[in-house]
A protein has these predicted regions:
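Charged catalytic cores and adjacent phosphate/nucleic-acid-binding surfaces used
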Residues: 1-20, 39-43, 47-54, 60-77, ...
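Aromatic-lined carbohydrate-recognition surfaces of secreted/lumenal glycan-active proteins
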Residues: 96-104
Length: 171
């Protein structure tokens, strides 16, 4: 539920190559969640609407990441976390918190107290997190609150595409 393209500052992967790799690995949809940008996701969705969910991984004012899924307007980097969640919801999107307990980018879970009531799903497995306990903490936090748990590759290279996924009925 969380993948990047070359529109992210830390990824060089062509958007179409990312989708091709995902389809080759048996995934039928990808959530393109570039850092603070949505143009590549929108363009890919326009060409392959049945395979792409538009998202954005927003670096909030608190320096933690919040993902908006099913959005159509970019949310500026540096927007406060609570406002980011509200702006996602205003677009009819879902608030998804990636790697919530990973030090710098997740803030060690500290932002969850502030935005927990606005969270639609939390990333309980991130394939790029090497410390299992960080994923386990996310799952425990979500379960204690009855919040759905997602998973993702957080792919920044083509080789990482498909290392984490969510199985669900087609929609």
């Amino acid at each position: 539920m969380h993948i990047h393209t070359r529109q992210s500052f830390d990824c060089l992967s062509d958007p179409e190559a990312v989708l091709e790799r995902a389809l080759a690995r048996g995934l039928d949809k990808i959530c393109v969640t570039d850092h603070n940008e949505i143009d590549a996701a929108l363009a890919l969705k326009a060409r392959y609407p049945e395979h792409v969910i538009v998202g954005e991984e927003v670096k909030t004012a608190e320096r933690v990441d919040v993902i908006g899924l099913f959005i159509h307007e970019r949310i500026p980097k540096g927007t406060p976390a609570r406002e980011t969640c509200e702006r996602i919801r205003e677009q009819g999107g879902l608030v998804y918190v990636p790697h919530p307990f990973a030090g710098g980018k997740g803030g060690g879970g500290r932002i969850l107290d502030e935005i927990g009531d606005l969270v639609d799903a939390i990333e309980g497995f991130n394939a790029r997190i090497h410390f299992r306990r960080l994923n386990e903490r996310a799952v425990a936090w979500a379960k204690a609150r009855g919040i759905p748990v997602g998973a993702g590759s957080d792919a920044h290279t083509l080789a990482e595409v498909g290392r984490g996924w969510v199985e669900m009925p087609a929609f």
